[in-house]
Structures are given as structure tokens and as C-alpha cells.
Regions:
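Short linear motifs at protein or domain termini
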Residues: 1-104, 111
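Hydrophobic side-chain positions on well-ordered alpha-helices
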Residues: 16, 135, 154-156, 201
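Short, cationic motifs built from Arg/Lys/His that form the positively charged side of catalytic pockets
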Residues: 27, 42, 46, 102, ...
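Residue-level recognition of alpha-helical structural elements
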Residues: 91-94, 118-121, 138-146, 158, ...
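Secondary-structure edge/capping motif, primarily at the C-terminal ends of alpha-helices
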Residues: 112-113, 132-139, 202
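C-terminal all-alpha effector/ligand-binding and dimerization domain
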Residues: 126-133, 148-150, 160-163, 167-229
Length: 229
């Protein structure tokens, strides 16, 4: 996808804010300085400010300019913000907070999937599961298949509001999976069995078993995460 100039500046400043170049409470450079630095117009910079405000990374103060917002006000459900934070630094507090969201959301998603999944949905989940099995010693390919698996489960719920959370949930899952992948004989068979158990529960339309399978999967992921942090 080709980015326009506004988008490119948003990404640059957003990443600089998240990385700590501009700390919360400090001011961004003046509008005129940003225009000069990025070789662009005031209208473009004002569009950038509006975008960063929507992500709650900055606050505009009358006659004073743009200031970095406190971290606890940042919009972590904005997929750009979440991805920038996860790319920039491993923050155990953020991972822990988002893992709590997984515990809240994913068991319900699993139950609804068991109640609503179509034959086409089941084929998508099974395809991703088979790719996980086939690539269980290839970290990158395995994690991509794992993400596809969970996305397919979410898609099978057929809830348009939940779909809006899909990218944020996937970003979190990707960050967790990349840090908790363990291809050894002590862990990989258990991981694959947990994913198969969830698929089987969904396939058999067993909501209770699907919910329990999701809880078991999250507990295993959380345990592995704690072991490496």
C-alpha cells in the first residue's frame, strides 16, 4: 500500500513518541519547525496533529502547540499505536494487561464459534491448524499459521463489532506468540494438542469444551510468557 505524505509523517512522529524521543508532557516542535523539517505545508502538519490526537498520543493546548499525552491515555486499541509500542520495546505490563483482555474475550469467542461456525469456517480453521502442524519447527511459518488459526476462529463468530477488534487482537497475539514459541519436544506437542482440542470442540458444536479449551490455551501461553520474563 502506498502511503501519502501525511501518513508517512504520522508514522514517523508516532514512532518517535512511542520510542521516548518526545516524553509525555513535553512539547512537539513548533508547527513551523515541523513544516521545515518534513518539507511540507502547515495544512499537512495540522492533518498529522489531528491523526495523532485521534490516537491520543498528543494533546493540543491553545496558543502553546502539541504536547505528548500521558502513556495511560494512549489508544492501545488503535492498531498503529499498539504495533509501534510492541515493536519498540517489550513491556511486560502491557503484555499482562492485554493478556487479561485475552482471558476476557477469547473464551467467549470460542463458545460462540462452536455455536455459529459454518462448514466453510471449519475448513479455514482446519487449514490453519494443518499448517501449524506442518511447520511446527519453523518459528515464523508456525506463528503466521497460528495467527491465521485464531483469526479464522474469530471470523467464524460472524460478529461485525468483534471484527473491528481483530487487528488489535492479532497484534497482541503476534507479540505473545513470537516470545512464547517453543519448538522443543516438551512444549510443541502440547501446543498443537491444545489447538486441536479447540478445533474439535468447535467442530462438534460443544460450547463448554470450546470455552475450556480456550482457557487452557491462554493459561499455557501465560505460563510460557512468565518463564521468559
Amino acid at each position: 500500500m502506498t502511503l501519502n505524505k501525511t501518513d508517512r509523517i504520522v508514522i514517523t512522529l508516532g514512532k518517535q513518541i512511542v520510542s521516548g524521543k518526545y516524553v509525555p508532557g513535553s512539547a512537539l516542535p513548533a508547527e513551523a519547525d515541523l513544516c521545515e523539517g518534513f518539507e511540507t505545508s502547515r495544512n499537512i502538519i495540522r492533518e498529522v496533529f489531528r491523526s495523532l490526537m485521534a490516537k491520543r498520543l498528543i494533546e493540543m493546548k491553545r496558543y502553546r502547540g502539541a504536547f505528548i499525552a500521558p502513556r495511560n491515555q494512549w489508544n492501545y486499541l488503535d492498531t498503529d499505536v499498539l504495533q509501534w509500542v510492541l515493536e519498540n520495546d517489550y513491556d511486560p505490563r502491557l503484555i499482562s494487561a492485554m493478556s487479561e483482555i485475552r482471558n476476557l474475550v477469547e473464551p467467549a469467542i470460542a463458545r460462540w464459534a462452536a455455536e455459529r461456525a459454518t462448514s466453510s469456517d471449519l475448513a479455514e480453521i482446519e487449514s490453519a491448524l494443518n499448517d501449524m502442524i506442518a511447520n511446527n519447527q519453523d518459528r515464523e511459518a508456525f506463528n503466521e499459521a497460528d495467527i491465521r488459526y485464531h483469526e479464522a476462529v474469530l471470523q467464524s463468530v460472524h460478529n461485525p463489532v468483534l471484527q473491528q477488534l481483530n487487528v488489535a487482537i492479532s497484534s497482541l497475539q503476534r507479540a505473545v506468540f513470537e516470545r512464547t514459541w517453543m519448538g522443543d519436544a516438551a512444549n510443541m506437542p502440547k501446543t498443537l494438542q491444545e489447538h486441536k482440542a479447540l478445533f474439535d470442540a468447535i467442530r462438534h458444536q460443544d460450547g463448554d469444551a470450546a470455552e475450556q479449551a480456550a482457557l487452557t490455551m491462554i493459561a499455557s501461553s501465560t505460563r510460557r510468557l512468565k518463564e521468559i520474563t
